[in-house]
């Protein structure tokens, strides 16, 4: 009775007011699963293709009726009768059905919507939580939140070049305590910014986006907020950055427009070294451009034993890109975004490859999110140890944190919060 009876896709809105794909998969016994697909603002050139209508008369060209139609008319009819419990078989069939290396024919947003909805329907059929279905009996690690509380770059209209300034409550003893600590720092940051006369409106991911004077000032106000909340920077709470350096890379140089300077890869590495020496920074994501492999190698040689170096645009949740990084010895961590690759199975394969090679994994949202909480379950399913899903603000972000609170409650005394121990490959 776990055979697929019906597949229905529709166009819904994401947290930015842009259309995205939602899919329902209904099984023979009436059990069903629903999934909504996220969308990024800062996207890697090597990501799977998100199919948009490009019709300027609808949603400024951002409609997804073609992707929806591909599910309803092509994918749906093709997988009727398939066993929802065969996730690998269904995902492989979807990849074959599309037939392109980047899912450009049917759209990664169409394929992922189906893949996620199938997994949810299967979990519901078995009466299991999604994290347990995907991860098995040992899925019990609650992730440390990487909370993006200050925004710059593509996520904000200000003169800060670094895209995200995050806090990580690694000194907490449980996920719920970490969430509370993060929320307290977030509220204190609002007070700090207000006191300095800065705007406290929030950006796409719930973080503040004030017009600060420099990247360093952003770190300084966060350190002040951590202390104001009664915590010790570098002991209770650490700082993580997402530079999104591909967005800064022009003609072989990294252009920091907010600061009016341009730097070579070697100068960027020196810049990061100085920041890490001065502030409690434990993680830098996309510190170099996605195609600057030499820059990445230098960065890894200089900082790879001391802090987490995360590849997002560099790896785009893709096993081939990750394997290249492993072979070249660059980065030591990978950001996992379901919609960068387009199926649950490929995502799990990438996580497995990272694990086998000593890379940490961070499960991540996109800047355009929905109320879907799949990634919270995925983080626990694979014992990732870290999750990146925005500030403790805006329902689209908080939905994931609330799901993790429920999972922690359900796991009870078996739940593990690793905190600093999640960084198993650096001398933290």
UniProtKB/Swiss-Prot annotation:
NCBIfam families: eno. GO terms for biological process: glycolytic process. It is found in: Cytoplasm; Secreted; Cell surface. GO terms for cellular component: cell surface; extracellular region; phosphopyruvate hydratase complex. Its cofactor is Mg(2+). SMART domains: Enolase_C, Enolase_N. It comes from the Bacteria. Its main location: cytoplasm. The gene is eno. Its EC number is 4.2.1.11. The active site is at 205 (proton donor), 337 (proton acceptor). Keywords: Cytoplasm, Glycolysis, Lyase, Magnesium, Metal-binding, Secreted. Binds a second Mg(2+) ion via substrate during catalysis. GO terms for molecular function: magnesium ion binding; phosphopyruvate hydratase activity. This is Enolase. It is an enzyme of class 4 (lyase). Belongs to the enolase family.
């Amino acid at each position: 009775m776990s055979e697929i009876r019906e597949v229905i896709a529709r166009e819904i809105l994401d947290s930015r007011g842009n259309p995205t794909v939602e899919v329902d998969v209904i099984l023979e016994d009436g059990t069903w699963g629903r999934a909504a697909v996220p969308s990024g603002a800062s996207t890697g050139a090597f990501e799977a293709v998100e199919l948009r209508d490009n019709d300027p008369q609808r949603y400024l060209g951002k409609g997804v009726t073609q992707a929806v139609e591909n599910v309803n008319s092509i994918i749906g009819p093709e997988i009727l009768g398939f066993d929802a419990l065969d996730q690998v078989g269904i995902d492989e069939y979807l990849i074959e059905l599309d037939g392109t290396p980047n899912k450009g024919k049917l759209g990664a947003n169409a394929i992922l919507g189906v893949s996620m909805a199938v997994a949810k329907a299967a979990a519901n059929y078995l009466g299991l939580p999604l994290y347990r279905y995907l991860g098995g009996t040992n899925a019990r690690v609650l992730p440390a939140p990487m909370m993006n509380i200050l925004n710059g770059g593509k996520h904000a209209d200000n003169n800060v070049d670094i895209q995200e300034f995050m806090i990580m409550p690694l000194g907490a003893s449980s996920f719920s305590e970490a969430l509370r600590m993060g929320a307290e720092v977030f509220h204190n940051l609002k007070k700090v910014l207000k006191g300095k006369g800065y705007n406290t409106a929030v950006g796409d991911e719930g973080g503040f986006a004030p017009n600060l004077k420099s990247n360093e000032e952003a770190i300084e106000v966060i350190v002040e907020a951590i202390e104001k909340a009664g915590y010790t920077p570098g002991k209770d709470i650490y700082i993580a950055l997402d530079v999104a350096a591909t967005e800064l890379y022009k003609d072989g140089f990294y252009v920091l427009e907010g600061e009016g300077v341009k730097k070579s890869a070697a100068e960027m590495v020196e810049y990061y070294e100085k920041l890490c020496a001065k502030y409690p920074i434990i993680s830098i994501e996309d510190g170099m451009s996605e195609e600057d492999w030499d820059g990445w190698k230098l960065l890894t040689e200089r900082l790879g034993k001391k802090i987490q170096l995360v590849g997002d645009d560099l790896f785009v949740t893709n096993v081939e890109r990750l394997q290249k990084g492993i072979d070249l010895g660059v980065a030591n961590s990978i950001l996992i975004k379901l919609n960068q690759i387009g199926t649950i199975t490929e995502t799990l394969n990438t996580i497995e490859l990272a694990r086998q090679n000593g890379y940490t994994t961070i499960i991540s949202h996109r800047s355009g999110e929905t109320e879907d909480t799949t990634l919270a379950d995925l983080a626990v399913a694979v014992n990732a140890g870290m999750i990146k899903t925005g500030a403790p603000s805006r329902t689209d972000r908080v939905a994931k944190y609330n799901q993790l609170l429920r999972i922690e409650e359900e796991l009870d005394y078996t739940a593990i919060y690793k905190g600093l121990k999640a960084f198993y490959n650096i001398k933290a």
